[in-house]
C-alpha cells in the first residue's frame, strides 16, 4: 500500500489540455471550416425538398453549479433572470430556421443540452417546447427520441414529471451517487 500520493507535475502539464469529448459523432474537433449562410440555406432547402426527418438540438448554456468534469459551453450563475434574454433570442432562431423547412418534416430527434437545461423554470421549459411545437412537427406519440440533460442535484420529482409531460424520455447516464 502507498503511504503517500505522488503527483507527477511534468505528466500533469503534458496532458493538461483540452481534448475531444466523445459524446457525439463526429466530434467537434472534426469541424474545421465555417458554414456560410448560403451553405445553411442550401442544406435547409435540400432537407425541405426531400422531406427528411429532423434532429434538433437546443443549447441552454446556464448552470447553477459547476460540474468539474464538464467541458461544455456554459455560464455558471445563480441569477435565473439571465435566461430571459437568451430565450428571446432562442425563439427568434427557432423562427428563422423553421421558416425554411416544410411543416410536414417530422422531428424524430430532439435534444436539450447545456449547460443544464433544467436551469430554466417550469414555465420557461413549457414556453420553449410550445414555441418548438408551433414551428416544428414534433411527435406526440412517444416515438421520438427526445432527451434532455439534467443536474440530478437540482431535479426534483415535479421537474421529472414536467419533463415527461413535455415528451422527454427519462433515463440516467450514471449510477454513481456522486459524479461531480
Name the predicted role of every residue range:
Residues 1-54, 103:
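Flexible, acidic/Gly-rich N-terminal and inter-domain linker regions that tether
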Residues 53-87, 166, 176:
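Canonical Radical SAM [4Fe-4S] cluster-binding loop centered on the CxxxCxxC motif
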Residues 60, 114, 150-152:
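A cross-domain feature marking catalytic cores of carbohydrate-active enzymes
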Residues 63, 90, 112, 148, ...:
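Conserved, mostly hydrophobic/aromatic
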Residues 81-91, 152-158:
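Glycine-rich anion/phosphate-binding loops
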Residues 92-111:
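Short Fe-S-cluster ligation motifs
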Residues 104-108, 121-180:
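Radical SAM/AdoMet-radical enzyme domain recognition
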Residues 111-117:
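Glycine-rich beta-strand-to-loop/alpha-helix junction loops that act as flexible
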Amino acid at each position: 500500500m502507498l503511504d503517500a500520493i505522488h503527483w507527477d507535475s511534468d505528466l500533469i502539464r503534458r496532458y493538461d489540455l483540452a481534448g475531444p469529448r466523445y459524446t457525439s459523432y463526429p466530434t467537434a474537433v472534426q469541424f474545421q471550416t465555417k458554414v456560410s449562410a448560403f451553405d445553411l440555406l442550401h442544406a435547409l432547402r435540400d432537407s425541405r425538398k426531400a422531406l427528411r426527418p429532423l434532429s434538433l438540438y437546443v443549447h441552454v448554456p446556464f448552470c447553477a453549479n459547476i460540474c468539474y468534469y464538464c467541458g461544455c459551453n456554459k455560464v455558471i450563475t445563480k441569477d435565473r433572470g439571465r435566461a430571459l434574454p437568451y430565450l428571446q433570442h432562442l425563439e427568434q432562431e427557432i423562427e428563422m430556421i423553421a421558416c425554411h423547412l416544410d411543416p410536414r418534416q417530422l422531428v424524430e430527434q430532439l435534444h436539450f443540452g447545456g449547460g443544464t437545461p433544467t436551469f430554466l423554470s417550469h414555465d420557461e421549459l413549457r414556453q420553449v417546447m410550445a414555441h418548438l411545437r408551433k414551428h416544428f412537427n414534433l411527435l406526440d406519440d412517444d416515438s421520438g427520441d427526445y432527451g434532455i440533460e439534467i443536474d440530478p442535484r437540482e431535479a426534483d420529482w415535479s421537474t421529472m414529471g414536467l419533463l415527461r409531460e413535455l415528451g422527454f424520455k427519462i433515463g440516467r447516464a450514471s449510477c454513481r451517487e456522486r459524479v461531480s
